[in-house]
Amino acid sequence: LKNGSVLRAHFAHVKLQHCPYHHEAESFEHLELKASLYDWASRESNTEVESYLADFQQIADLLVVDKNLALEVQCSSLSLERLKERSDAYRSHGYQVYWLLGKKLWLKERLTKLQAGFLYFSQNRGFHLWELDLTKKELRLQYLIHEDLRGRLHYQTEIFPFGQRSLLEVLRTPYLSQPMQQMAVELDRTFLTYIQQQLFYRHPKWMKLQEELYLQGHHLLELGLDFFYPLCRPIVSQNLLQIEEDVEGYYQKFMAYYQSQDIQPVQILYPPRFYAQQKS
């Protein structure tokens, strides 16, 4: 790479618009993040930018050649179908792929269907994803991602400044041996009022539950908070495109752990391996 932000961003090779395999306009953020990651990864590994993989006609933003590892810097929205197609193509040809998200795709208060497609899973960090921040020059691991029954996200953050550690070691963080993580979430004491509002506005999710309870001779508004406990739970989605392992056992052990306890003013959340260690 040449010095200077303009030439650096274009990687001192054929301009991308003239590349026969390049079809998408790239933002300044995307170009600069790729350049930063190239600088970081190439310190320890043979790394290529805009690497064309002829076997399945796909371009990797960055390819760590000796590790069969693709790094995709995603700064704009794409369809779930396209995300699945690209992710499956990498895996079926023996490549591991990490999707690293630009600013438009960072986690906010609620998880979108597309963001669910970028989630990874490990026994030590649970559901997690990776964010890139060009302004702060840092890679962020958002982990122990949970959702409460209002649909709001709760998660922890670990920050890795660009270039300070081995990039490959950083990306392995969720899978390395480590102390048990945890996260505290206060009990939502106004949740029953929220339920009342949802029924008033006839929200489909809560109307469906109310209908099921009605057939059993109950009503949502008769129930106490303990019926809904735990109020903060792991992500459940049909769009977990990066996760190949079966997480159903984790869901079951999670629910069994909290339902065996009295309702707590603060819910302490742990990674999957904690629940796996509990005796049933």
Name what the model sees in each region.
Residues 119-280:
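Non-catalytic C-terminal interaction segments of nucleic acid-processing enzymes
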Residues 49-58:
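Short, solvent-exposed loop/turn elements at beta->coil junctions and helix N-caps
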Residues 11-49, 65, 280:
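Acidic-basic catalytic patches of nuclease active cores, encompassing PD-(D/E)XK
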